[in-house]
Amino acid sequence: MQFTKLFILTFFFVFTAKPLLAHQSECQEQLNSNFNRPCLERLIPRSLDPLNRNMMQPSVVKVSNQYSVSGSLTEDNQPLIVVIGASGRTGRFVLESLAKRDLRIRALSRNIAKASADIGGNYEWVYADVTQPETLVMALQDSDIIISTIGAKPGKGPDGPESVVYKGVINLVDEAKRAGTRHIIYMSSIGAGGAENFSTVFLNLFMNKTLKWKSLGEEYIRNSGIDFTLVRPGGLYGDPGTQGIKFDQGDKIIGSIPRGDVASVLVESVYNPDAINKTFEIINDESLPVDAWKDEFKNLKTGEYGKIQSGRLPFSYWGSMLILVLLIVLLIRRRRRRKRAA
């Protein structure tokens, strides 16, 4: 009798808990007619609904038409490229790659004296911290393109994922709109669009929901009205330029890639018009030619980015765990019956 009650309760929970755990979503209206994108379903975290819902509702503004409609550049122009996170391990490779082209470069860091001394180069170093929006006003002034390689440290606090890759991204995007920035190239990570991948669930559970905050930061950029390129690299390590680079969408692949290769893709996104308004993953693939990746941008689709993170354990995992518990209970009961019968 007790087992029957347990089964009924489990069945009720599995088939009724989904709407209780689910998040609300709604279509983000595209007010800018210059950006023809399909309706994007925007996640509305319940934790923000009663507090400050407008944090997930960036006002869509019209971007200046001073440049070409496609948003691409030719190397005859000298746009101002702002690199945020320039003194980081990936940001340094970005600066090195940009320095090979005829560009104006502004490097942002939270410790410009140390960064300038360690990295050198003919860069305009400016102090900026995405968690302090007032520091972004001068840092982004007159910027044409932003390349962001910012990352968060594990844990909570001012350097944690929520503060840096979510709220910090909101600060960055809002100031970029005021500054008239026309293209944001943002380094995210694989897993930000894989809502039910095991690795994503694991990192969200044990790394302070890192991928949830990255996913929501990505969505804020997508809904900003500014041209964007969201690059999701795999694990970062190794020497650049030794293997081919595989492009994919929908957050269905896993792998690794050197920081130097990631920087090359970020910088190429400045010039390639096929990179505009795309979200994609990149990993190394030894079966591909080393330089063939530059032709992959044209195969990417807009509006393809996987699933937006909620940070909660997916319903399928809850159901699987409950069924597993039920089976374990059933096995225990059978063993006890056999012992009694013996």
Task: For each feature predicted by the language model, list its residue ranges.
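SDR active-site strand-loop-helix element
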Residues: 84, 108, 149-150, 184-190, ...
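Active-site-lining helix/loop region of Rossmann-like oxidoreductase modules
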Residues: 86, 238-323, 327-341
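N-terminal Rossmann-fold cofactor-binding loop
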Residues: 108-112, 130
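Conserved beta-loop-beta element that borders a ligand/cofactor-binding pocket
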Residues: 188-191, 198-200, 204-206, 216-240, ...
